[in-house]
């Protein structure tokens, strides 16, 4: 049994293990190649987060989904590079919008070089992803364009907030489907599609990816509250400080409205105050970590991960399917 990737994914098949490891190594080379520029400063900025590491969750899904067809097909590694470049580009932009100063345990690009360079570097990565996509054919371009549209729509919905009368939790889950589920779903879709898997298999894996992506982001929401920076590589409570609603906070507000408990209302008022104040921020984190809303968010994460597992039911039993099931379990384990 060998662990592959940061999730401690146990691969019990030597051929699968070798395929995944070789594929991930090729993706790493592809990422470094795709982020090179004739201008050294652009190379430095574009490779900043590549070299900082990361989970490479999306390329891993491409490699596993490719096991259901010709796992040596030439489009697999480039498509994995595309989804990771797209993901990295969104991180540059997210950190500007969130005013985050730490990403993957290093200074964020905006903290190091300013907002303009960070935004333009994200744009550069999108451009490089498009260049690779052009060689993968019109269907790949269309699939990526649809996912990118959903991703941006999710970001806009998050910024705009729920419309009057809309349940905030439902709105938030829709946001996550766009912001995170779309690209994770495309990772699975590309792996299956590029390997020439049957359309039914492509659809099943896409549904799995969509649900897993939401579970993955919900786990991140929990980690943002529950972990320290050593565990997550990010500043704890970044979303909290910026007033960005995440599921633990939404579950708290839901409970406060339903039960009217004084301590819940007081915590909501604290969250509505200026959390750029370090003492207030630390107190809000402490109270949320001990609040039932955090456990409710963990249960929500488990539910989405279980939905992802259920989506795999039509697939034949094989080591790749087992690995995908284990991956959904690993996502839940991250949330504690």
Where are the regions a protein language model picked out?
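N-terminal amphipathic/basic leader segments beginning at the initiator methionine
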Residues: 1-34
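A short structural micro-motif
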Residues: 67, 150-151, 211, 273, ...
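Mobile late-domain/C-terminal helix-loop "cap" segments
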Residues: 261-312
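Mg2+-dependent prenyl diphosphate-binding active-site environment of isoprenoid biosynthetic enzymes
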Residues: 11, 26, 32-262, 329
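Short, contiguous acidic/charged loop-to-helix segments that flank catalytic cores in large enzymes
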Residues: 235-237, 295, 315
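Residues at alpha-helix boundaries and the short loops/turns that link adjacent helices
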Residues: 52, 56, 135-138, 154, ...
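Short, amphipathic C-terminal "tail helix"
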Residues: 304, 310, 317-336
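Short, charged, amphipathic alpha-helical segments
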Residues: 14, 18, 206, 299, ...
């Amino acid at each position: 049994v060998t662990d592959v990737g940061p999730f401690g994914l146990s691969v019990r098949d030597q051929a699968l293990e070798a395929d995944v490891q070789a594929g991930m190594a090729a993706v790493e080379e592809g990422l470094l190649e795709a982020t090179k520029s004739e201008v050294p400063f652009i190379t430095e900025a574009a490779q900043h987060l590549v070299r900082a590491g990361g989970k490479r969750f999306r390329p891993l899904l491409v490699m596993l989904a490719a096991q259901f067809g010709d796992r040596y097909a030439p489009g697999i590694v480039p498509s994995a590079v595309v989804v990771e470049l797209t993901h990295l580009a969104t991180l540059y932009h997210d950190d500007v919008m969130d005013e985050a100063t730490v990403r993957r345990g290093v200074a964020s690009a905006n903290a190091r070089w300013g907002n303009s360079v960070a935004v333009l570097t994200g744009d550069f990565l999108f451009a490089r992803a498009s260049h690779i996509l052009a060689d993968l054919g019109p269907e790949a371009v269309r699939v990526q364009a649809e996912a990118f549209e959903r991703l941006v729509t999710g970001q806009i919905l998050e910024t705009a907030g729920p419309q009057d009368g809309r349940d905030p939790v439902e709105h938030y889950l829709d946001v996550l489907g766009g912001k995170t589920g779309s690209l994770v779903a495309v990772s699975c879709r590309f792996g299956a599609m590029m390997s020439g898997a049957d359309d039914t298999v492509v659809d099943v894996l896409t549904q799995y990816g969509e649900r897993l992506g939401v579970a993955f982001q919900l786990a991140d929401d929990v980690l943002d509250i529950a972990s320290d920076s050593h565990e997550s590589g990010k500043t704890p409570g970044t979303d909290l400080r910026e007033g960005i609603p995440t599921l633990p906070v939404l579950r708290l507000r839901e409970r406060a409205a339903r039960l009217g408990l004084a301590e819940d209302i007081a915590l909501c008022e604290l969250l509505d105050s200026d959390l750029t104040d370090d003492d207030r921020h630390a107190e809000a984190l402490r109270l949320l970590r001990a609040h039932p809303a955090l456990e409710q968010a963990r249960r929500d994460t488990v539910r989405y991960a279980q939905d992802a597992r259920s989506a795999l039911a039509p697939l034949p039993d094989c080591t790749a399917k087992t690995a995908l099931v284990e991956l959904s379990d690993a996502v839940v384990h991250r949330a504690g």
